């Protein structure tokens, strides 16, 4: 997701998979493939691991029609989803997960496999054993992540609290073991010894060498290379950082909890809402509330807006102190690990920027590019105020939202009120996404009947992703409808990454029951299924077995009814396209090693595919594929979309400028200033505003940075959102020719992006991937010059009618 740049606080080190050398199948394994007697199974024939390739037009048309119907028609879905009283196949078809306790069984079995791999790595002595170390460590990552990622998803998504609890217990068990591994010096020493031996490292593939570097960096971030005293201090600091970050988020508070305003000064705001907050002629507005934001956009009285603005931009002294304490702890931790600052530490690891100076070059170039349009927008706001107030009134900080809203409302009043959502039924949108991916990448969505126990709620649809060349390539679970207590936040979850399984790994499954006498191992119909825990896999023409990416998309769209399908707003359409961008990255980047599969690429590249999909959501040729009225079947008039985008992006340059300043603040707070033992976050923020803001800066006495919660989860990487937005615009303009002449749907353009960038995941230098996709040699080496170049491209999207080719 930054994913995106987003999305979940998952552990970084042991997160991904394993790819083993492709070897000739042993006679034992061939025998087991004929009938895997170790786990005689009576699974139904529908539990196949693969789907054959089909080129029949009839099948494609049927799948396309059915895809729309299962999302738009409750009756069709009820008939298609079938009988749920058969044999329970387990959640996600993981055969261990047929009951709440199954999570604990799955965790125990996985821990046994993990410990066996750790022993192999620690006891490696021969050249062959050292050559296998990267594969073993990557498989170790996959074993832990099979539990961690599924359990993490289930504990926040599953409606059954008992299953949530056991999933949390399984997660805790694996996370505790993962933390032990992260500081295990023996594993680090063995990896370094393998990397430093040319007789070992020269036999590795490029992908294998990339995984080795990733693992080494992750170990280094855990201070495993330091003396014991330093390691102990690092562990203590890490705990303090975690606790302080949690305190900052949970106890964030304004200096003034409520702002008291004379009721007579609240004209312009919804009178019903004002009355609800009023008492004895006063209005009491909670400082950090939606009502405060609405008031800043609608209340006409300058004095009232000034009061509300000052309160909403001023965090309490305690909150600011906690933030600064967090920055100092991070600085101390980075210094202990041998880095100049926390920013240097973070950017050293799987980031295209590599250094804080590169980030500054990008942000300053982007600021220069954005300034002319931002100045024009400030001039428009000032003109609106003067038209309202008369004379030579100047724009104040508390005026910006009010006059921006008045200009947007004026745009709306000149336009007919269009019902865009009637053209975006969820079924037609899913149908459209499948058609887009078919044209660009040769893959489509095929509805698959969920088996008993496979999904966590009856509303969840399973789609198999089928390639016209490779057959079944991924599994996609769609949990898209609203239900009580469900998280409203849209998200993409990778439940399992791509990974190639070795013949020896598959053969090992015959001993699973003997190695786990206290756990009842499920029955499987083959060794391949056993190695995949019952989940989907594919077999290539050369016989290689790969576990398939398994993905969940979660949204909060309105439920369909018997007489009307679920209809999406344009914002919801963009959201679904964005999340599907993450999914397509996971689907296309089916690498052999899990550590570099799918979205496990450079962190500041992860949001590029998802942000790019937002351009497709606004392209007329793309919308023509599916956007039709759910009752009349009339096509969507594109000018309605153009008007909607124009309204939404009216002050995009000022919004971008604000994001630039926040990204700069993130860099400054994580710079060497935090290593020196004192940091004044308020002065840093105000100084950046004075230097880079075209809009009026916050007045003295405010301290908005105390509300910047993203500093906890995105420390020193907040720039990534802007970076990927600029890159997405460039890819759209260069690779897809801004959609001109139907370029958004041309297969050669999709193949260009896939072959140069998407299919590699994190297995190739991202700058080389980007240079190949854009055919721009200036990017190949990366560094400060490349970052500055990207910043100079700018990031204002505009609308189709004013977009440059």
UniProtKB/Swiss-Prot annotation:
Question: What keywords sit in the KW lines?
Answer: Hydrolase, Metal-binding, Metalloprotease, Mitochondrion, Protease, Transit peptide, Zinc
Entry-linked SUPFAM superfamilies: Metalloproteases ('zincins'), catalytic domain
Q: How is the cofactor bound?
A: Binds 1 zinc ion.
Identify a single GO molecular function assigned to this protein: metal ion binding
Pfam family example for this protein? Peptidase_M3
Could you mention a single GO BP entry for this protein? protein processing involved in protein targeting to mitochondrion
Q: Which domain of life, per UniProt?
A: Eukaryota
Which reactions is this enzyme annotated as catalysing?
Answer: Release of an N-terminal octapeptide as second stage of processing of some proteins imported into the mitochondrion
Q: Does the keyword Acyltransferase apply?
A: no
Enzyme class label: hydrolase
In the UniProt entry, which residues are flagged as the active site?
579
Q: Where does Zn(2+) bind?
A: 578, 582, 585
Keyword Transit peptide (UniProt):
yes
The EC designation for this entry is: 3.4.24.59
Q: What does this protein do?
A: Cleaves proteins, imported into the mitochondrion, to their mature size. While most mitochondrial precursor proteins are processed to the mature form in one step by mitochondrial processing peptidase (MPP), the sequential cleavage by MIP of an octapeptide after initial processing by MPP is a required step for a subgroup of nuclear-encoded precursor proteins destined for the matrix or the inner membrane.
Query: What is this protein called in UniProt?
Result: Mitochondrial intermediate peptidase
The source organism is Neurospora crassa (strain ATCC 24698 / 74-OR23-1A / CBS 708.71 / DSM 1257 / FGSC 987)
- Which gene produces this protein? oct-1
């Amino acid at each position: 997701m930054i994913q995106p740049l987003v999305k979940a606080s998952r552990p970084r080190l042991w997160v991904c998979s394993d790819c083993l050398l492709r070897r000739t199948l042993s006679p034992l394994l061939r025998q087991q493939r004929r009938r895997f007697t170790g786990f005689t199974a009576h699974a139904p024939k529908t539990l196949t691991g693969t789907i054959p390739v089909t080129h029949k037009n009839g099948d494609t048309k049927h799948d396309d029609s059915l895809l729309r119907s299962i999302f738009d028609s409750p009756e069709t879905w009820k008939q298609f989803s079938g009988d749920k009283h058969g044999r329970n196949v387990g959640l996600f078809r993981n055969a261990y997960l047929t009951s709440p306790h199954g999570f604990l069984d799955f965790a125990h079995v996985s821990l046994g496999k993990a410990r066996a791999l750790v022993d192999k790595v620690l006891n490696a002595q021969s050249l062959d054993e050292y050559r296998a170390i990267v594969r073993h460590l990557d498989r170790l990552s996959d074993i832990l992540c099979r539990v961690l990622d599924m359990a993490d998803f289930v504990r926040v998504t599953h409606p059954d609290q008992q299953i949530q609890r056991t999933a949390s217990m399984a997660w805790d068990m694996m996370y505790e073991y993962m933390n032990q591994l992260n500081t295990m010096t023996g594993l680090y020493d063995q990896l370094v010894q393998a990397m430093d031996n040319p007789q070992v490292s020269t036999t590795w593939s490029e992908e294998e060498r990339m995984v080795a570097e990733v693992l080494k960096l992750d170990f280094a971030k855990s201070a495993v290379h330091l003396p014991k005293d330093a390691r102990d201090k690092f562990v203590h600091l890490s705990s303090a950082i975690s606790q302080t970050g949690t305190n900052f988020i949970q106890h964030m508070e304004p200096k003034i909890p409520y702002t008291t305003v004379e009721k007579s000064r609240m004209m312009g705001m919804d009178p019903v809402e004002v009355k609800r907050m009023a008492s004895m002629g006063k209005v009491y507005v909670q400082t950090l509330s939606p009502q405060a934001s609405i008031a800043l956009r609608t209340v006409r009285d300058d004095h009232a807006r000034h009061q509300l603005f000052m309160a909403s931009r001023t965090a309490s002294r305690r909150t600011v102190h906690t933030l600064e304490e967090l920055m100092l702890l991070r600085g101390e931790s980075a210094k202990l690990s041998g880095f100049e600052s926390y920013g240097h530490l973070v950017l050293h690891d799987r980031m295209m920027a590599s250094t804080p100076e590169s980030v500054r070059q990008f942000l300053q170039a982007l600021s220069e590019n954005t300034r002319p349009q931002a100045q024009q927008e400030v001039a428009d706001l000032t003109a609106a105020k003067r038209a309202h107030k008369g004379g030579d009134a100047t724009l104040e900080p508390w005026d910006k939202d009010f006059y921006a809203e008045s200009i947007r409302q004026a745009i709306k009043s000149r336009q007919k009120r269009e019902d865009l959502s009637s053209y975006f039924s969820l079924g037609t949108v899913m149908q459209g996404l499948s058609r887009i991916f078919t044209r660009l990448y040769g893959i489509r969505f095929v509805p698959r009947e969920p088996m008993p126990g496979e999904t966590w709620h009856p509303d969840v649809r399973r789609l198999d992703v089928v390639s016209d060349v490779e057959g079944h390539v991924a599994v996609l679970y769609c949990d898209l409808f609203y239900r009580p207590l469900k998280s409203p936040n849209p998200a993409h979850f990778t439940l399992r990454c791509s990974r190639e399984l070795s013949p020896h790994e598959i053969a090992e499954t015959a001993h699973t029951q003997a190695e786990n006498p206290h756990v009842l191992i499920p029955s499987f119909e083959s060794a391949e299924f056993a190695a995949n825990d019952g989940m989907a896999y594919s077999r290539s023409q050369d016989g290689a077995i790969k576990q398939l990416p398994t993905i969940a998309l979660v949204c909060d769209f309105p439920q369909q009814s018997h007489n009307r399908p679920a209809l999406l707003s344009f914002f919801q359409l963009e959201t679904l396209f964005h999340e599907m961008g993450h999914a397509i990255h996971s689907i296309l980047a089916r690498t052999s090693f899990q550590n570099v599969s799918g979205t496990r690429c450079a962190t500041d590249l992860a949001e590029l595919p998802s942000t790019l999909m937002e351009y497709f959501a606004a392209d007329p040729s793309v919308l023509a594929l599916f956007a039709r009225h759910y009752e009349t079947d009339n096509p969507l008039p594109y000018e309605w979309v153009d008007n909607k985008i124009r309204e939404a992006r009216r002050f995009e340059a000022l919004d971008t400028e604000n994001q630039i300043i926040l990204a700069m603040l993130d860099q400054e707070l994580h710079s060497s200033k935090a290593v020196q033992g004192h940091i004044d976050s308020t002065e840093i923020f105000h100084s950046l505003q004075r230097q880079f803001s075209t809009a009026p800066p916050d007045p003295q006495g405010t301290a908005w940075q105390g509300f910047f919660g993203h500093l906890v989860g995105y420390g020193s990487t907040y720039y990534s959102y802007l970076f990927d937005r600029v890159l997405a615009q460039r890819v759209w303009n260069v690779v897809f020719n801004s959609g001109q002449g139907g370029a958004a749907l041309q297969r050669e353009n999709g193949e260009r992006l896939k072959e140069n960038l998407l299919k590699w995941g994190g297995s190739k230098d991202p700058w080389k991937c980007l240079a190949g996709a854009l055919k721009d040699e200036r990017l190949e080496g990366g560094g400060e010059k490349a970052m500055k170049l990207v910043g100079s491209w700018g990031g204002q999207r505009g609308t189709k009618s004013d977009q440059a080719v």
